[in-house]
């Protein structure tokens, strides 16, 4: 009996483990022709040490940075272009050099000149880093490049015999891997897998040839060797080359025998198949699971024909496809559902959602904006559409009984919807006259479930409806309030109280007597948009001016200051000490105790979405549902806290008058003439998530300080006057803070020659000399003039004396 119980428990645990493995969600961020890729069939992917993503296709090489996609092609009249547009393989050596392998040769990328130098004219298909160099696999040939000597030597797998010709294509080297530090496994196209001994420098056949082509060779962390041959499934070998397992469609959960690539990620083998998506294989359980493209499922794998899998140094997983470009695969706890054709269970009947209701069993009823009523079952991850309701705008949903829902339809009033018959029947608020006033006097009646037997119907007036005895009671206020401009709106509810909002006022509703009283109010120019309770006597409040909270103990309102957003559409508190905030089409979380924000973007599972509705009651499950104009958002609140990674910012290029100027930097300083036309500074930002958009803060320091905030990684400076400038930059992180500003470069704008110090100095000296010369000449002339005048004066006096004497002498 105990043995049977143990077996049952083991099987149950294994089933739970297996099912939990299948509950993982993934987001797929895609780059294809629509985003600017030169061609959709991807042959190779590489993320270099600077954070640039390189994509090799059958028609061109592409690089992706924050500035977008740049394409490189072969040009017959340019010796520094690619040898061929067909890219076989990309690799980066230990020195950070980028190598591009094509059928017409191997090229080395010159980053400074942004061009290519062809080093080998033969076709290259693979590579492996070795001590002191890098090896490249060709047809029956390995080219061994040495870093120190910069020379290449050649190794042949099979030597040519005089009487026997070798088919070089059969010995094409598709893959080279290390089983240990002294051995390299060399996988050929048709002639099996060879072992190369690095000490004896000899080849030996390790795994015999297969009738089919070798498509992949991979060694796991536990030293198992996995191979795939075209159409033959998956093979597993031990370290001696002895076969351990052979998995096919007939003897395992593998769904496709055509495996094109293998890699290891998060403890599983990931298998790229030709037509059936990606298979995940867990060696410890011997179980297979699949990621596939599902028509109508926005969050599924983009395409099913996968050519390659690549794990970069940041541990991101990438997939290349036959017709869909590349996509980054990221495990996520947020999933967005969009619309599908009617009765397709993989999506909504209409992506715009305006109401939600969650049952106790976790199923979610969804009111769409024109697509009627939908039902989502989280246990199956499927939707049910109700065609009889298609075309209706369902603005609220509540539960009358296990078999019926109370729904409010835009411009039609309130109805009861039978879950089984899928039909409506009319519902009257008190009597026909009251019903007409509440439904058709310019107000929209909203039915909100606040307790098991109670629904608040809020329109021109507010009513509490008892679902057991089918009675109405008008909800009373503690004093008169002017609700003439709009109706009250329920923002939050639990078993004890509810919260209503109206313009700048927040109201408290006691569940015992359904009385309404003012809780707090803000300035009249501020509108409350959402409220939520965190079970710690705090009412969190979102407004059109930001985030705040009302403390029920101190009866005071406090603001949370942040530059991340200012206009909140919805917020909701989970049971894990977090707020989920929807603002300006973005999603943020706020860890209350740590006062820490986190930004969630499309690679996390949340593309830009205007959230229109969030369910007012806290779920007993681990999910939060948000209804938006771009679909249903499902958040798993078990999401782990993300570690904030500080992005690396570095200078990638400088263009002066459109020409590269990076080489002219000396001691992080450049000199440019005063009459330049254009100056652009280009940045690269290296971070794990290369799709994250960064708000860059440029600081230009001179006699004064200028601040520029932009998402553009290119800073254009076209009108700097003569002087010295220091350019600093910082960017935002995932938690909403900014990095410490770092110096990018010093810029010296030299003035025109007539404004230079040397010219001004010489001019000053010449002015002084000229002035002194003129003064000296003037002095000399004046002195001479005065001397002449003196002589003339003395002569005149002498003449007068002589004349007087002559007059006195008698004749």
Report each predicted region and the residues it spans:
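Intracellular C-terminal tails of type I single-pass membrane proteins
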Residues: 803, 808-811
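Cytosolic signal-transmission helices at domain junctions
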Residues: 773-802
């Amino acid at each position: 009996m105990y043995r049977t119980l143990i077996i049952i428990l083991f099987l149950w645990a294994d089933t739970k483990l297996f099912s939990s493995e299948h509950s993982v969600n993934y987001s797929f961020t895609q780059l294809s022709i629509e985003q600017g890729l030169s061609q959709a069939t991807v042959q190779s992917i590489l993320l270099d040490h600077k954070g640039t993503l390189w994509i090799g296709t059958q028609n061109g090489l592409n690089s992706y940075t924050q500035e977008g996609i740049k394409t490189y092609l072969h040009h017959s009249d340019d010796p520094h272009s690619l040898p061929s547009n067909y890219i076989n393989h990309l690799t980066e050596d230990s020195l950070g050099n980028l190598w591009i392998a094509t059928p017409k040769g191997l090229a080395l990328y010159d980053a400074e000149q942004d061009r290519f130098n062809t080093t080998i004219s033969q076709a290259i298909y693979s590579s492996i880093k070795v001590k002191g160099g890098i090896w490249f696999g060709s047809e029956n040939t390995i080219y061994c490049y040495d870093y120190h000597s910069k020379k290449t030597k050649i190794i042949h797998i099979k030597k040519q015999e005089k009487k026997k010709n070798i088919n070089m294509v059969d010995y094409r080297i598709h893959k080279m891997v290390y089983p240990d530090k002294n051995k390299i496994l060399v996988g050929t196209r048709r002639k099996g897998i060879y072992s190369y001994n690095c000490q004896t420098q000899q080849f030996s056949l390790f795994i015999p040839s297969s009738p089919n082509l070798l498509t992949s060779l991979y060694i796991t962390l536990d030293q198992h060797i996995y191979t795939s041959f075209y159409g033959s499934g998956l093979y597993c070998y031990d370290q001696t080359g002895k076969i351990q397992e052979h998995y096919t469609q007939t003897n395992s959960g593998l769904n496709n025998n055509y495996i094109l690539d293998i890699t290891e990620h998060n403890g599983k083998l990931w298998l790229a198949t030709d037509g059936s998506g990606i298979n995940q294989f867990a060696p410890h359980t011997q179980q297979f699971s699949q990621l596939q493209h599902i028509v109508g499922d926005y969050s599924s794998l983009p395409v099913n024909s996968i050519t390659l899998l690549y794990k970069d140094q940041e541990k991101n997983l990438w997939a290349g496809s036959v017709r869909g470009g590349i996509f980054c695969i990221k495990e996520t706890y947020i999933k967005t559902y969009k619309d599908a054709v009617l009765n397709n269970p993989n999506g909504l009947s209409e992506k715009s959602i305006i109401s939600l209701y969650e049952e106790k069993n976790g199923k979610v009823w969804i009111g769409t904006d024109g697509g009627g009523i939908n039902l989502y079952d989280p246990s199956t991850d499927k939707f049910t559409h109700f065609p009889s309701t298609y075309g209706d705008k369902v603005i609220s949903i509540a539960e009358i009984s296990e078999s019926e829902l109370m729904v409010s339809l835009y411009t039609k009033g309130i109805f009861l919807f039978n879950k089984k018959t899928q039909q409506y029947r009319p519902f009257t608020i008190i009597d026909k006259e009251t019903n007409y006033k509440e439904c058709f006097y310019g107000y929209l009646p909203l039915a909100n479930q606040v307790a098991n037997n109670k629904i608040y119907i809020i329109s021109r007036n507010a009513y509490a409806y008892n679902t057991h005895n089918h009675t109405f009671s008008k909800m009373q206020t503690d004093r008169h309030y002017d609700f003439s401009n709009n109706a009250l709106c329920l923002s939050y509810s639990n078993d004890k109280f509810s919260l209503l909002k109206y313009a700048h006022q927040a109201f408290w509703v006691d569940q015992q007597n359904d009385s309404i009283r003012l809780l707090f109010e803000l300035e009249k120019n501020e509108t409350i948009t959402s409220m939520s309770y965190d079970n710690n006597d705090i009412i969190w409040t979102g407004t059109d001016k930001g985030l705040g909270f009302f403390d029920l103990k101190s009866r005071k309102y406090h603001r949370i200051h942040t530059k991340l957003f200012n206009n909140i559409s919805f917020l909701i508190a989970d049971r894990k000490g977090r707020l989920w905030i929807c603002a300006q089409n973005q999603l943020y979380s706020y860890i209350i105790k740590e006062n820490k924000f986190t930004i969630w973007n499309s690679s996390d599972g949340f593309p830009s979405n205007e959230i229109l509705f969030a369910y007012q009651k806290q779920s007993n499950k681990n999910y939060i549902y948000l209804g938006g104009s771009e679909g249903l958002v499902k958040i798993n609140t078990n999401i782990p806290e993300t570690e904030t990674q500080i992005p690396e910012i570095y200078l990638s290029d400088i263009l002066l008058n459109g020409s590269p100027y990076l080489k002219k930097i000396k001691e992080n300083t450049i000199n440019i003439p005063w009459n330049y036309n254009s100056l652009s500074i280009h940045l690269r930002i290296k971070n794990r998530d290369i799709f994250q958009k960064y708000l860059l803060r440029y600081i230009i320091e001179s006699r004064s300080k200028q601040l520029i905030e932009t998402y553009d990684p290119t800073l254009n400076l076209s009108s700097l006057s003569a002087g010295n400038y220091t350019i600093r930059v910082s960017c935002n992180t995932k938690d909403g803070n900014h990095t410490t500003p770092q110096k990018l470069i010093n810029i010296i704008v030299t003035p025109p020659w007539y404004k230079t110090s040397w010219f001004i100095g010489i001019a000053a000296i010449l002015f002084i000399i000229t002035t002194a010369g003129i003064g000296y000449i003037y002095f000399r002339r004046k002195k001479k003039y005065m001397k002449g005048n003196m002589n003339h004066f003395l002569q005149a006096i002498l003449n007068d004396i002589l004349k007087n004497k002559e007059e006195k002498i008698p004749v």
